Amino acid sequence: MTEPMEEYRSELKKLAEKVMEVMDENLGLPKEYIKKAFNGGYGENAFFGTKVRGLQIHKDGEWIDVQPLPNAIVINTGDQIEVLSNGLYKSVWHRVLPIPGENRRSIASFYNPSLKATIAPAPELVEKVDQEVDQAYPKFVFGDYMSVYAEQKFLPKEPRFHAVKAM
């Protein structure tokens, strides 16, 4: 079982790095900017392999169903990508609800920065937005942020950004 899992992990890493390359390009950042910012860490969140509904995202004060698509992968960006992109990509609250009478199987995978990585808005993106937005995202060490996150996981992200900014 070890060999298939290692192969699976390797392919997930390749996928995550490809997604980061596309994000770099879309944001007009230098090649491998996000990967380098992650400092060797392993923040996308991907859900694989289910044909059963139940995944929801929170938008504009309500929960919206994410419709399952055959052979599709759902990728949620994390708070660290929101900060690196200076808010151009948003992290999303999500949840999975049980559906009576249906079996839902999915595999969640995370590609997070190293706990020692410093996360901050990309300087190229700070220049593209107004001063009010510039100050919305703090610079932080990812491990410090995860400590705050562990205590405030199900609360809005803005207080977490504020708490880590004060560290």
Where are these regions (language model features)?
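C-terminal flanking tails of non-heme Fe-dependent oxygenases
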Residues: 1-167
